């Protein structure tokens, strides 16, 4: 008996510490990537610890294996990069994929619903801070966009977009705690609007449309009403930014079209392994399109094109396999009945990521990727009982 207690006590402590670390990641990623990554290291250590102490079999959701294969082919691309050392250093981001097994192991059962409450609460605080930032802007809003406590407004708006997907899913499909989601939703919506990030707007709208259709197709009739309210109340700066989405003469639109052509040329020259992770910026001037606006860009502002250009067409095929496997699994979970809001949130997050990802390389953003992997893993973790 004493031997059993001696074995169980350390693993129980590891389980509690691992869960606290993952909760901390979800909260801190909205404010500090450094803190979130430190907590991820702790969570990974706890995960490995319970595997050793309890001799647990490693369990992951099925969609993790395509993601692992994507990590593997990324390393192959790095090995054949024009600057292998720099590309291999950039591959440290692949560690973030371990968000999937740590969430799957530690955020089981009711912890998954609690995790959503944590995300909504800290996102509400972040949104409020961003709105205050916007209210204090005195110069050109496009050059002083709210970014919360994060380093860039695109990262900030992308995270808010994902949280909006989760909040609306809880409002429409949740069995409990819908009130808090409804309370924070206006702040989230206003905060993402004032970032003036068009890709996040489009992604959030796509996610909302999907959720409304899943709930009741007739609810899509709400969208024109919301659009009318937006046009009636939006400040001139926001309206001008919205109109620019459809302006082919807009410099940022022209530059994005040029980046697609640049990506096409990179893919044609390096179809199998790409130019190498983090090498697009290095080679940008060599492939720069004559109609490009900016002299250099760090990436191509399109997830599929960026992956194919950096890592090759086989890597893109594996990434699409990951997305397909994840989407099918989440859809099956949604149609299985029971509490469907976590599966709905996952489907909405996938939709938001893919839609916004046509205009921004969000899958390569560490903060965004961590939050995305948390959200899409939750419905599968919730179905599990904590290992005995």
Task: Write out the residue ranges for each language-model feature.
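A membrane-periplasm/extracellular boundary helix in multi-pass inner-membrane enzymes
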Residues: 57, 128, 212-253, 258-269, ...
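Transmembrane signal-anchor hairpin modules in multi-pass inner-membrane enzymes, especially those
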Residues: 1-86, 98, 106-117, 171-179, ...
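Transmembrane alpha-helices of multi-pass inner-membrane enzymes
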Residues: 19, 42-48, 218-225, 322, ...
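Hydrophobic transmembrane alpha-helices and their immediate junctions
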Residues: 311-351
């Amino acid at each position: 008996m004493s031997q059993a207690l001696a074995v169980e006590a350390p693993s129980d402590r590891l389980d509690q510490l691992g869960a606290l670390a993952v909760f901390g990641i979800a909260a801190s990623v909205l404010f500090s990537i450094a803190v979130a990554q430190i907590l991820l290291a702790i969570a990974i250590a706890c995960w490995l610890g319970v595997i050793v102490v309890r001799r647990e079999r490693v369990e992951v959701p099925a969609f993790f294996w395509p993601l692992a294969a994507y990590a593997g082919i990324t390393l192959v691309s790095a090995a054949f990069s024009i600057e292998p050392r720099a590309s291999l250093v950039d591959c440290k981001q692949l560690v973030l994929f371990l968000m999937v097994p740590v969430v799957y192991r530690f955020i089981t059962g009711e912890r998954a619903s609690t995790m959503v409450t944590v995300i909504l609460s800290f996102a509400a605080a972040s949104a409020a801070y961003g709105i205050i930032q916007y209210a204090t802007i005195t110069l050109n809003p496009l050059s002083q966009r709210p970014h919360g406590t994060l380093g860039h407004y695109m990262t900030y708006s992308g995270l808010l977009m994902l949280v909006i997907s989760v909040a609306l899913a809880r409002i429409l499909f949740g069995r409990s705690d819908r009130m808090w989601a409804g309370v924070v939703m206006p702040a989230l919506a206003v905060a993402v609007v004032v970032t003036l990030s068009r890709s996040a707007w489009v992604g959030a709208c796509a996610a909302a449309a999907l959720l409304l259709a899943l709930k009741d197709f007739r609810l899509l009739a709400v969208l024109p009403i919301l659009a009318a309210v937006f046009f009636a109340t939006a400040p001139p700066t926001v309206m001008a930014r919205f109109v620019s989405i459809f302006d082919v003469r807009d410099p940022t639109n022209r530059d994005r079209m040029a980046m697609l052509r640049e990506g096409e040329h990179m893919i044609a020259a390096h179809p199998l392994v790409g130019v190498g992770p983090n090498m697009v910026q290095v080679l940008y001037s060599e492939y720069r399109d004559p109609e490009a606006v900016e002299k250099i860009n760090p990436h191509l502002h399109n997830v599929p094109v960026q992956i194919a250009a950096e890592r090759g067409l086989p890597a893109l095929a594996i990434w699409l396999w990951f997305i397909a496997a994840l989407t099918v699994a989440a859809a099956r979970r949604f149609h299985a009945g029971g509490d469907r809001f976590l599966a709905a949130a996952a489907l909405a997050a996938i939709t938001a990521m893919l839609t916004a990802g046509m205009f921004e390389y969000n899958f390569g953003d560490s903060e965004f990727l961590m939050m995305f992997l948390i959200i899409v893993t939750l419905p599968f973790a919730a179905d599990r009982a904590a290992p005995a």
